[in-house]
Regions:
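Conserved ATP-binding N-box helix of the HATPase_c
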Residues: 37-62
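Bergerat-fold GHKL ATPase/HATPase_c domain
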Residues: 1-45, 149-159
Length: 159
C-alpha cells in the first residue's frame, strides 16, 4: 500500500523572476510541517538552484516554457520535484523510474551545470534525477524529531 501524502503543484513560467513565488510556497509548506528555520532556508536555496538550472539549461534563458514544481508532503519528510518540461507528473510513477544522484555521474549529461547540483546535494537529505524526458530533480528533506511541531509552542530565550 502506498504511503499517504498531500500533493501541492505549482507551475511557473521558465523565468528567473518567478523563483521568489516558489520560495514563498516552499517556506509556507515547510513552516506548516514544522521544519526549523535553517532547514527551510536550505530547502529554499536547493529548490531555487534546481529552478535556476532549468531556466538556464532547459530553456536557455528564453523565457519560453514552464517549470512544474511538485511538493509531496509526508508525515516525516518533504519531497520536492522540479520538472523542466512543465508537464504534470505522477509522483509515484516518477519515483519508480528515478535513480539516486551519484557524485561521479556525468553532470553535463544531466544539464545541471556543476556547482548547483553539488549545492542541492549538500543541502538536501536525498537527491534523485530522471533525465529521460527533460530533467526531473527529486529532492527529499526529512523532518527531524527535534524540530518544533506545527502545533508546538514557540521557543523562547527568556524565562
Amino acid at each position: 500500500m502506498m504511503e499517504s501524502f498531500d500533493f501541492v503543484e505549482v507551475k511557473v513560467p521558465a523565468k528567473a523572476e518567478y523563483i521568489g513565488v516558489v520560495r514563498l510556497s516552499t517556506s509556507g509548506i515547510a513552516n506548516r510541517m514544522g521544519f526549523s528555520f535553517e532547514d527551510i532556508e536550505d530547502l529554499k536555496v536547493a529548490i531555487s538552484e534546481a529552478i535556476t538550472n532549468a531556466v538556464k539549461h532547459a530553456y536557455e534563458d528564453s523565457g519560453e516554457g514552464e517549470i512544474t514544481i511538485g511538493f509531496g508532503v509526508y508525515e516525516d519528510r518533504l519531497e520536492v520535484m522540479v520538472a523542466d518540461h512543465g508537464g504534470s507528473f505522477n509522483l509515484g510513477e516518477v519515483k519508480e523510474d528515478i535513480g539516486p544522484y551519484q557524485q561521479d555521474d556525468n553532470i553535463e549529461e544531466l544539464r545541471e551545470g556543476g556547482f548547483g547540483l553539488f549545492l542541492i546535494d549538500a543541502l538536501m537529505d536525498k537527491v534523485e534525477i530522471n533525465s529521460k524526458y527533460g530533467v526531473i530533480v527529486l529532492m527529499t528533506k526529512y523532518l527531524h524529531e527535534t524540530e518544533v511541531g506545527q502545533n508546538g509552542d514557540q521557543i523562547s530565550t527568556t524565562q
